[in-house]
C-alpha cells in the first residue's frame, strides 16, 4: 500500500506503528528513534503536544510489535531485514581487543602464586600480630559479669522473683500432680 497518495484525513486515521513501518520500508536503513518520531510527525501533520501525548504508547507498541527490532543506541530497524542468525551478531557491540604490553621479564607470568597454593600458619600470624590467645572459658566468664543482669527500679523492680524449687537436680514428681 502506498501511503504517499493518501489524503490528510486518511493519514490521520493511521496508527503510528503503521507509519513507522512505512517509513522504515521506504528508507531501507536503520533510523534513530527521535528521527523516526520527527518523520512520523511530519507525515501525519501532528503538533508537538499531540505527538508527546502518544509517544509513550508508540514506544511501547514498537517494543511489543514483532516487526521492529532495537539494535541498541536507540536505533531501530525492521526485523525482516535480519535473518535470525545475524540478529545476535548485529546487536552485540564491536569491541577491539586490547593490545598486550611487552614485558621485560616473561618469567613473572609463569610464577603467578595463587592464594590456594600458600599454606598459612595461624600460630605464626598470631605471634607476629602480638595477639594473646583467648580461651572460650574466659569469654564465657566475661559475659556472665555483665551489668545487664540487674533490673532497674520501676515496674521490673516491683515484680516478685519466683525461685525454682528444683534447681539442685533432685527433682521428684509431686504425688499431688498426678
Swiss-Prot record:
Residues 14-81 form the HTH HARE-type domain. One of its GO terms (cellular component) is DNA-directed RNA polymerase complex. Pfam families: HARE-HTH. Residues 105-122, 141-150, 161-178 have a biased composition (Acidic residues). GO terms for biological process: DNA-templated transcription; regulation of DNA-templated transcription. It comes from the Bacteria. GO terms for molecular function: DNA-directed RNA polymerase activity. Residues 88-122, 141-178 are annotated as: Disordered. The keyword Nucleotidyltransferase applies. The keyword Nucleotidyltransferase applies. Keywords: DNA-directed RNA polymerase, Nucleotidyltransferase, Transcription, Transferase. Participates in both the initiation and recycling phases of transcription. In the presence of the delta subunit, RNAP displays an increased specificity of transcription, a decreased affinity for nucleic acids, and an increased efficiency of RNA synthesis because of enhanced recycling. RNAP is composed of a core of 2 alpha, a beta and a beta' subunits. The core is associated with a delta subunit and one of several sigma factors. Belongs to the RpoE family. NCBIfam families: RNAP_delt_lowGC. This is Probable DNA-directed RNA polymerase subunit delta. It comes from Listeria monocytogenes serovar 1/2a (strain ATCC BAA-679 / EGD-e). The lineage of its organism: Bacteria, Bacillati, Bacillota, Bacilli, Bacillales.
Amino acid at each position: 500500500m502506498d501511503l504517499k497518495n493518501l489524503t490528510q484525513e486518511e493519514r490521520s486515521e493511521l496508527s503510528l506503528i503503521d507509519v513507522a513501518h512505512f517509513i522504515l520500508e521506504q528508507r531501507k536503513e536503520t533510523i534513530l528513534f527521535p528521527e523516526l518520531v520527527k518523520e512520523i510527525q511530519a507525515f501525519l501533520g501532528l503538533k508537538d503536544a499531540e505527538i508527546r501525548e502518544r509517544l509513550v504508547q508508540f514506544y511501547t507498541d514498537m517494543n511489543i510489535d514483532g516487526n521492529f527490532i532495537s539494535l541498541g543506541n536507540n536505533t531501530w530497524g525492521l526485523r525482516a531485514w535480519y535473518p535470525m542468525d545475524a540478529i545476535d551478531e548485529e546487536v552485540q557491540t564491536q569491541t577491539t581487543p586490547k593490545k598486550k604490553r611487552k614485558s621485560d621479564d616473561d618469567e613473572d607470568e609463569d610464577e603467578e602464586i595463587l592464594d590456594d597454593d600458600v599454606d598459612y600458619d595461624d600460630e605464626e600470624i598470631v605471634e607476629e600480630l602480638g595477639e594473646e590467645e583467648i580461651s572460650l572459658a574466659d569469654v564465657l566468664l566475661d559475659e556472665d559479669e555483665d551489668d545487664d543482669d540487674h533490673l532497674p527500679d520501676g515496674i521490673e523492680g516491683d515484680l516478685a522473683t519466683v525461685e525454682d524449687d528444683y534447681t539442685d537436680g533432685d527433682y521428684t514428681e509431686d504425688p499431688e500432680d498426678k
